[in-house]
């Protein structure tokens, strides 16, 4: 399930950026915007599903060492998903969106950093830190 989660995040971030830049200079969405946005929504559902699955698996093992950090990552991840959607909708409507875009990018970086340092992440695997 971890591989599905990582794959969904990578594709989701790419789709978010491509959807964000798929507007004309006048601010109208291009033809490719709607399919890109719908595909992004599909991947956002996959991200949420695989993330919740991982949280349930972690809490079921009850090791207790990383529950607070995992909960913080879960909250950040839900925030990223919400900000992605709100940013694109506000841009489509012509409302201010640049602050939301940069806030989304910042929260993506924080969420990815939390995912890297959690057990099962690359840093934990590199130094053989087990649960």
UniProtKB/Swiss-Prot annotation:
GO CC term, one of those recorded: plasma membrane
Membrane topology: Multi-pass membrane protein
Segments passing through the bilayer: 1-21, 42-62, 69-89, 99-119
Keywords: Cell membrane, Membrane, Transmembrane, Transmembrane helix
Listed Pfam families: DUF1516 (PF07457)
Cell location: Cell membrane
Chief place of localization: membrane
Similarity annotation: Belongs to the UPF0344 family.
The protein's name in its UniProt record: UPF0344 protein Sca_0577
